[in-house]
């Protein structure tokens, strides 16, 4: 029980004002551990948007204690998709991937939090829905490897590149109070 309490407490850990940029390293106390507050790109793909899964995805990230700092729905331009998937250009499925990703709207989001890159990868599950564990987004909602509902950055460096590709800095919010402000409760 104690371990569960501390894991929950760490998930909701809020740091002071953010420095510019998608990643921030914060040290708590002298000689204490390092806590990395990061940003990552998460995109609900056209099949997820069409199946109205955006709310379920947002709910999972919010329950995990992450802070939404940017979100938009768009018909992804082929130029953005080509740059986003540049590492897959030589793969035989690349043309079909670009057609699929441009077949309908995508909901792109930037989430911020403690180790959010690694945590989001665990939350979305294996790329192949047949191998994705139940309880993961793909394990619960994906029906085929080519229609796997969601994308999440696979590294801090990849997240930085992808966020800059999909968002302008003016489209991202910096929570001055660490995301703890509530409009329902007076300050």
Swiss-Prot record:
One of its GO terms (biological process) is nucleoside metabolic process. SMART domains: NDK (SM00562). The active site is at 151 (pros-phosphohistidine intermediate). It is an enzyme of class 2 (transferase). Binding to anionic phospholipids, predominantly to cardiolipin inhibits its phosphotransfer activity. It is found in: Mitochondrion intermembrane space; Mitochondrion matrix. The keyword Cytoplasm does not apply. Homohexamer. Interacts with OPA1. Interacts with CAPN8. This is Nucleoside diphosphate kinase, mitochondrial.
């Amino acid at each position: 029980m104690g371990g569960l309490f501390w894991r929950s407490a760490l998930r909701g850990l809020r740091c002071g004002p953010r420095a510019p940029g998608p990643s921030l390293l914060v040290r708590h106390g002298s000689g204490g551990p390092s806590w990395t507050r990061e940003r990552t790109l998460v995109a609900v793909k056209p099949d997820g948007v069409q199946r109205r899964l955006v709310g379920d995805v947002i709910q999972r990230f919010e329950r995990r204690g992450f802070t939404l700092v940017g979100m938009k729905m768009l018909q992804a331009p082929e130029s953005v998709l080509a740059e986003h998937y540049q590492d897959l250009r030589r793969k035989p499925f690349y043309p079909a991937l670009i057609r699929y990703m441009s077949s309908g709207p995508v909901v792109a989001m930037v989430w911020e939090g403690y180790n959010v890159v690694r945590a989001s990868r665990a939350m979305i599950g294996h790329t192949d829905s047949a191998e994705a564990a139940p309880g993961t987004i793909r394990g619960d909602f994906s029906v085929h490897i080519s229609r796997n509902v969601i994308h999440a950055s696979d590294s801090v460096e990849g997240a930085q590149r992808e966020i800059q590709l999909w968002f302008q800095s003016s489209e991202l919010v910096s929570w001055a109070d660490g995301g703890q402000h509530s409009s329902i409760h007076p300050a």
